[in-house]
From Swiss-Prot:
Keywords: Amino-acid biosynthesis, Arginine biosynthesis, Cytoplasm, Transferase
EC number: 2.1.3.3
Keyword match Cytoplasm: yes
Molecular function in Gene Ontology: amino acid binding; ornithine carbamoyltransferase activity
Similarity-based family: Belongs to the aspartate/ornithine carbamoyltransferase superfamily. OTCase family.
Annotated gene: argF
Protein name: Ornithine carbamoyltransferase
One Pfam family, short name: OTCace_N
Any one annotated GO CC term: cytoplasm
Function according to Swiss-Prot or TrEMBL: Reversibly catalyzes the transfer of the carbamoyl group from carbamoyl phosphate (CP) to the N(epsilon) atom of ornithine (ORN) to produce L-citrulline.
Listed InterPro entries: Asp/Orn_carbamoyltranf_P-bd, Asp/Orn_carbamoylTrfase, Asp/Orn_carbamoylTrfase_sf, Asp_carbamoyltransf_Asp/Orn-bd, Orn/put_carbamltrans, OTCase_ArgI
Superkingdom per UniProt: Archaea
Recorded metabolic or biological pathway in which this protein acts: Amino-acid biosynthesis; L-arginine biosynthesis; L-arginine from L-ornithine and carbamoyl phosphate: step 1/3
Length: 301
């Protein structure tokens, strides 16, 4: 049974990108998922993940089924394994946006239908695929260098893995103590060694961004870290992606953000709404990338 829990589960990244492009260009009109149902479990609120999966499944002929934590018996103590086995009797695929990555791994271990990680505390593979689709269409390939500025979080983890897989150099500019997970760094480093790319973690954002082709940031206070908000806002202040920082990047550099954004914190309105920004194309590509993922996992190919 194929699942997408991590970027490392994509043994066909370029094929998926090509498929996503085909969906974006309207080359695939057949209802690949006609008669199928996708369960969408959300332990965290969502705009882009929910809407893109729901619209994408519908456009592919499937019936999306939204399930919040309060809709399921998980909140009342039903084991994850029991939920996985039960849903597998009803639906053809499960997309889950969860708090704990280990819960998603357990769910996939017991499910008899494909499970898609729609975001956990460790990874966000769907976002990473859409990001690479965006980079390829804007830059023409992966010869440039991506710099992630801010918290070494789940989005950063998936970007490290997918850029390494595609042979793209990536730097992470973050405060001491907010580096990416050591296990993810080690895994990405091994992949990078095989593909000839380079990964660095740097604490000086100016040094990291100088000459970069892609500058990427994310919120400083992710869901679940609200109690650290005051400390984080102070620690990350020097890591704001503003025009002064963007001017250090390559002249044709693009600015990316997985959204939602807090203008005035991790970036400024001048940047996110300015000429370098591709965030709306990036958000749109969530739809096309996730169609490719559903096609791959649920399309009987």
């Amino acid at each position: 049974m194929k699942h997408l829990l991590s970027v490392c589960d994509m043994d066909n990244v370029v094929d998926l990108l090509d498929l996503a492009d085909d969906y974006k260009e309207g080359k695939i009109r057949e209802k690949i998922l006609r008669g199928k149902t996708l369960a969408m479990i959300f332990e965290k609120s969502s705009t882009r993940t929910r809407v893109s999966f729901e619209v994408g499944a519908f456009q592919m002929g499937a019936q999306p089924l939204y399930l919040s934590a309060s809709d399921l018996q998980l909140g009342r103590g039903e084991p994850i394994a029991d939920t996985a086995r039960t849903l597998s009797r009803y639906v053809d695929g499960i997309m889950i946006r969860a708090i704990s990555h280990s819960d998603v791994v357990e769910l996939a271990g017991e499910a008899s239908v494909p499970v898609i990680n729609g975001l956990t505390d460790l990874e966000h593979p769907c976002q990473a695929l859409a990001d690479m689709q965006t980079i390829r269409e804007k830059l023409g390939g992966f010869d440039g260098r991506l710099v992630f500025v801010g918290d070494g979080n789940n989005v950063c983890h998936s970007l490290l893995l997918i850029t390494a897989t595609l042979g793209m150099d990536m730097d992470v500019a973050c405060p001491p103590g907010y580096e990416p997970d050591p296990g993810i760094r080690e895994m990405a480093g091994k992949i990078a060694d095989e593909t000839g790319s380079r990964i660095r973690v740097i604490h000086d954002p100016s040094e990291a961004v100088r000459g970069a082709d892609v500058v990427y940031t994310d919120v400083w206070v992710s869901m679940g870290y609200e109690d650290e908000a005051e400390d984080r806002l102070e620690v990350f202040r020097p890591y704001q992606v503003n025009m002064e920082l963007m001017e250090l990047a390559a002249p044709e550099a693009i600015f990316m953000h997985c959204l939602p954004a807090v203008r005035g914190q991790e970036t400024t309105a001048e940047v996110i709404d300015g000429p370098h920004s591709v965030v709306w194309d990036q958000a749109e590509n969530r739809l096309h990338a996730q169609k490719a993922i559903m096609h791959w996992l649920m399309g009987d190919i």
